[in-house]
């Protein structure tokens, strides 16, 4: 298997709700907008998609919709399929593969605090259950669990279909260290604030929250960097500074969904508890920053 298979500009899709249910029509439109604006892959049912509060049926439906909309296009589907129960992560990975997803994004197990050996066995079981590409997802600020550099490298070398890691630890030194020890690995930025530093230090793509709103700019930034045109990439990165900052003024995905609502890209500003709408102050701040950007709606 070619380990370079899912890289480039990728969007961590929000999940729009309406009257307490997944708004499937808006969801489909959002994916089509991504396709039309140069995104290389979409990631349904991940952190930004509020996977923790989706039912199992809703989670699977989000994957199915993404696969159906992307069918026949160049845009790939990297399905969110993580769990802190290995058997459930395996079941999700199998479902995603059987229903046409191009790859799997699997977050580190949260809450139960596995050892590094436990993490290794968890991911090995997932990788052995499917023959599609698997991207590890390291986000210790949310999971309370750090996948060590040694564990990431061992999994990459031992499991043919584990092709890299989405790094959302905010630790640039770790990212540089990973590539120094295993330059074949596909390092993917998982934080919009450090997309440019990661791409300019050997990263091969981004999984972006901001690209829900500005897919064309994130695509351009990513591809300029991959083409080693760092001057143009940095120029776009600088233009995105204020929006990247405000989109994390509260817990993701609260600000990005708010911005999408303000832009008229989703019909209803709904969250699943314990997530809730932003404060009035932050709503106003998001609205003010957005005035500086030209958002292309439906």
Swiss-Prot record:
The record marks 47, 111 as: Part of a proton relay during catalysis. It is found in: Cytoplasm. It comes from the Bacteria. GO terms for biological process: diaminopimelate biosynthetic process; lysine biosynthetic process via diaminopimelate. It is an enzyme of class 4 (lyase). The active site is at 137 (proton donor/acceptor), 166 (schiff-base intermediate with substrate). One of its GO terms (cellular component) is cytosol. Belongs to the DapA family. Homotetramer; dimer of dimers. PANTHER family: 4-HYDROXY-2-OXOGLUTARATE ALDOLASE, MITOCHONDRIAL, DIHYDRODIPICOLINATE SYNTHASE. HAMAP family: DapA. This is 4-hydroxy-tetrahydrodipicolinate synthase. It comes from Campylobacter jejuni subsp. doylei (strain ATCC BAA-1458 / RM4099 / 269.97). The lineage of its organism: Bacteria, Pseudomonadati, Campylobacterota, Epsilonproteobacteria, Campylobacterales. The gene is dapA.
């Amino acid at each position: 298997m070619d380990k370079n298979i899912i890289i480039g500009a990728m969007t961590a899709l929000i999940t729009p709700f309406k009257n307490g249910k997944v708004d499937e029509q808006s969801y489909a439109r959002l994916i089509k907008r991504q396709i039309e604006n140069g995104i290389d892959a979409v990631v349904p049912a991940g952190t930004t998609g509020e996977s923790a509060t989706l039912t199992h049926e809703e989670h699977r439906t989000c994957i199915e919709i993404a696969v159906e909309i992307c069918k026949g296009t160049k845009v790939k589907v990297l399905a969110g399929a993580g769990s802190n129960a290995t058997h459930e992560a395996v079941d999700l990975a199998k479902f995603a593969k059987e229903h046409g997803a191009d790859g799997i994004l699997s977050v580190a197990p949260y809450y139960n605090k596995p050892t590094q050996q436990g993490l290794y066995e968890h991911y090995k079981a997932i990788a052995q259950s499917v023959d599609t590409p698997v991207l590890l997802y390291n986000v210790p600020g949310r999971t309370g669990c750090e996948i060590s550099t040694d564990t990431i490298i061992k999994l990459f070398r031992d499991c043919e279909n584990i092709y890299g890691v989405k790094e959302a630890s905010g630790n640039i030194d770790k990212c540089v260290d990973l590539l120094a020890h295993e330059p074949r690995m596909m390092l993917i930025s998982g934080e919009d604030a450090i997309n440019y530093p990661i791409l300019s230090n050997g990263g091969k793509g981004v999984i972006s929250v901001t690209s829900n709103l500005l897919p064309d700019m994130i695509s351009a930034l990513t591809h300029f960097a991959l083409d080693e045109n760092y001057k143009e990439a940095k120029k776009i990165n600088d233009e995105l500074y204020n929006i990247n900052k405000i989109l994390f003024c509260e817990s993701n995905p609260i600000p990005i969904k708010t911005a999408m609502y303000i832009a008229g890209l989703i019909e209803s500003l709904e969250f699943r508890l314990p997530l809730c709408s932003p404060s009035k102050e932050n709503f106003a701040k998001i609205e003010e920053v957005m005035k500086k950007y030209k958002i292309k709606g439906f």
